[in-house]
């Protein structure tokens, strides 16, 4: 669990948690299946399990800052553990729109709680690790 605080305050104003795991290749759109993934039933993923911003700090850019920290941490984790993409499950239309604005892509057919991903290759380019 990674927490954001205001300087000098013990109060948490935002947080996130990451978890290594797998997800089903069959849910990926064909455009996301490269030759490597076609040979497997699951793809390795770094899942953004939890992310939240305190209500009084929402819509002030903190979520974007947290996600940039997630991307930097994902790049660092990729030096020690292999995975195809950063994944998450969006919980509502507002969060889906937020993640799409950061270039996450929906890869499941569940329209209420869509699964979204950001390929590691794109993360490495974004943080300048390529």
Model-derived segments and their meaning:
Residues 15-50:
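Conserved acyl-donor/pantetheine-binding loop and adjacent beta-alpha core of acyl/acetyltransferases
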Residues 49-59:
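A short, internal acetyl-CoA/4′-phosphopantetheine-binding micro-motif in the GNAT/acyltransferase core
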Residues 1-7:
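Cytosolic beta-strand hydrophobic patch enriched in CBS
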Residues 67, 92-95, 109-119:
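Short glycine/proline-centered loop/turn elements that form peptide/ligand docking sites
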Residues 9-14:
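Glycine-rich acetyl-CoA-binding "A-motif" of GNAT/NAT acetyltransferases
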Residues 59-73, 101:
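Conserved acetyl-CoA-binding loop-helix of GNAT-fold acetyltransferases
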Residues 75, 81, 88-109:
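Conserved active-site alpha-helix within GNAT-family acetyltransferase domains
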């Amino acid at each position: 669990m990674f927490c954001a605080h205001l300087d000098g305050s013990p109060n948490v104003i935002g947080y996130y948690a990451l978890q290594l795991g797998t997800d089903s290749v069959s849910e990926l759109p064909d455009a996301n299946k490269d030759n490597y993934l076609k040979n497997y039933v699951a793809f390795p993923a770094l899942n953004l399990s939890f992310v939240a911003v305190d209500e009084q700090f929402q819509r002030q850019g903190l979520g974007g800052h947290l996600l940039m920290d997630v991307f930097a941490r994902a790049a660092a984790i990729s030096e020690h553990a292999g995975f195809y993409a950063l994944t998450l499950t969006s919980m509502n239309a507002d969060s889906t729109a937020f993640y799409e604005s950061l270039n996450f892509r929906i890869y499941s057919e569940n329209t209420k709680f869509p699964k979204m991903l950001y390929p590691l290759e794109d993360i490495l380019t974004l943080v300048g690790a390529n």
